[in-house]
């Protein structure tokens, strides 16, 4: 309201600069931050819009409920396994059906499993409610529909990408998105030593998870051929499958950024490669 610009500093850079001081105190920190601002030795970070933060909050809440649901499923599966009952791989509503069948066959387990199962059923309903809200967001936004044209990318992944990037034009190159999301390998070079390590894992961990899951869907579930799927399949044969999925996730991030900025859709033809 006073007309002053609001600038947010990169906390990692500020911490590295302030760590040079011998004594840590609020006074020294305030003086150090003032010196950084005066000299301009700081990296400014993007302040996301309220809409992006609103979507992001829903995605985080949904992810937490999914984690709780998985933990409960593993807990019930472990309890039943200790009693000689093996449920096998399943999740969500399929897991609920197996639990109901199990309780029908062995009524004595009702007092043991039913309290956990009731919480599990509530979590499923709440996750479904979040899914409906996110789908409503995706239907009203043409950009999200175009992002969903990429094989393996659903409404949750598309919304997560929109809320994480917020402004696609702040990247000079589409390849910078991969580094921003922590999907590029770290590099250490000194003299004759030049070593490439694992991915940096900087940035949004939830977005990386969604892109990795999208890459997994592309390789294992999507049947329709595309240049992206062909490239990923060949890469998975040459290197470890997990590394290939990370590479596909990085390429997906670049493709999503290009689709967002160009106003195009995913091209399935060979000419698109």
Name every feature range the model reports, one short phrase each:
Residues 41-43, 72-73, 127, 166-170, ...:
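Short helix-capping/linker segments at secondary-structure and domain boundaries
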Residues 236-273:
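Basic, amphipathic alpha-helical segments enriched in Lys/Arg and hydrophobic/aromatic residues
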Residues 60-146:
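Glycine-rich, often acidic, oxyanion-interacting loops/wings at catalytic, nucleic-acid
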Residues 4-53, 57, 95-103, 193-202, ...:
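Short alpha-helix plus adjacent loop in nuclease-associated cores
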Residues 146-149, 155, 161-241, 273:
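Phosphate-backbone recognition surface of nucleic-acid-processing proteins
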Residues 81, 85, 89-103, 169, ...:
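HhH-family (HhH-GPD) DNA N-glycosylase catalytic core used in base-excision repair
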Residues 34-37, 59-62, 66-69, 73, ...:
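Short, amphipathic alpha-helical segments that act as regulatory/interfacial helices
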């Amino acid at each position: 309201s006073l007309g002053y610009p609001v600038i947010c500093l990169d906390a990692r850079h500020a911490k590295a600069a302030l760590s040079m001081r011998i004594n840590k105190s609020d006074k020294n920190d305030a003086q150090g931050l003032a010196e950084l601002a005066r000299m301009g030795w700081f990296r400014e970070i993007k302040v996301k819009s309220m809409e992006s933060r609103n979507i992001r909050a829903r995605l985080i809440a949904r992810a937490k409920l999914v984690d709780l649901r998985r933990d409960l499923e593993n807990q019930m599966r472990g309890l039943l396994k200790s009693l000689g009952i093996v449920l096998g791989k399943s999740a969500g509503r399929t897991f609920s059906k197996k639990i109901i069948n199990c309780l029908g066959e062995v009524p004595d387990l009702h007092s043991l499993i039913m309290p956990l199962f009731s919480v599990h059923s509530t979590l499923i309903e709440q996750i479904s409610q979040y899914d409906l809200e996110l789908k409503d967001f995706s239907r009203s936004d043409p950009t999200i529909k175009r992002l969903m044209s990429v094989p393996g990318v659903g409404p949750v992944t598309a919304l997560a990408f929109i809320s994480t990037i917020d402004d696609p034009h702040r990247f000079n190159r589409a390849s910078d998105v991969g580094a921003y999301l922590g999907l590029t390998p770290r590099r250490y070079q000194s003299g004759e030593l030049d070593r490439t390590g694992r991915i940096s894992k900087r940035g949004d961990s939830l977005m990386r998870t969604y892109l990795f899951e999208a890459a997994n869907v592309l390789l294992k579930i999507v049947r329709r051929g595309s240049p992206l799927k062909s490239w990923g399949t060949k890469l998975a044969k040459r290197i470890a499958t997990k590394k290939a999925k990370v590479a596909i996730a990085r390429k997906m991030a670049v493709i999503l950024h290009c689709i967002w900025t160009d106003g195009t859709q995913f091209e399935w033809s060979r000419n698109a490669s």
